[in-house]
Regions:
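Extended, low-hydrophobicity, polar/charged segments
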Residues: 1-191
Length: 191
């Protein structure tokens, strides 16, 4: 009963990069979204939220079962209900660096996985930059390798927009006397 990327990879004797991780999240309005990243990559939830222009949260195991009809560990992108939006990381593009290649994915059936699944043929998701960057990745602008360094935060900016002002009905009047929600931000110096 292999559920995790590591367990499936070890059982099949293939690298994690030959698997696709399928992660169900819930966006605003209870919209189910299936995010796909290569097995050796991690989903960057903030990137997905920014792409969706929505707040997101991981689906609870009972939601996964209700929406996809299978328990966590066997979720895959093939044959998901049309109500589920499927978004794959750019690294899975069939016309990308790796090209169209076969992957192992969850089968959306208990204790089962599918092999030979090709993105673009067996599943046609939309694509976005969804994965966490890591040391050695190429810069998308110049191609130089990314280096990861230990740093100290000296300041931060949180662009809150109207997330808090709109529900609180905190408004300002424009020149014509029309109300608009206050656009908020939080700016800090130091950790």
């Amino acid at each position: 009963e292999q559920r995790t990327i590591e367990e499936v990879s070890g059982f099949l004797g293939i690298p994690a990069s030959s698997l696709i991780k399928s992660l169900l999240v819930i966006a605003d309005g209870n919209q189910p979204v299936l995010a796909l990243v290569r097995g050796d990559h991690e989903l960057h939830e903030a990137k997905l939220a920014r792409h969706l222009m929505s707040e997101i949260r991981p689906a609870h195991p009972d939601e996964v079962a209700e929406i996809l009809g299978v328990e966590v560990g066997f979720v895959g992108p093939v044959g998901v209900p049309v109500s589920v939006r499927v978004i794959a990381d750019d690294s899975l593009r069939p016309d990308g660096v790796g090209g169209a290649r076969p992957y192992v994915v969850g089968a959306n059936q208990p204790h089962a996985h599918l092999s030979g699944v090709v993105v673009g043929r067996d599943v046609t998701p939309e694509f976005a930059d969804l994965r966490e960057a890591r040391a050695g990745d190429a810069c998308p602008h110049c191609g130089a390798q990314l280096q990861v360094e230990q740093v100290l935060e000296i300041g931060n900016i949180f662009k809150l927009g109207t997330k808090y002002s709109a529900p609180l009905k905190a408004t300002i009047l424009d020149e014509s006397g029309k109300e608009h929600p206050i656009v908020m931000g939080s700016y800090g110096i130091g950790p």
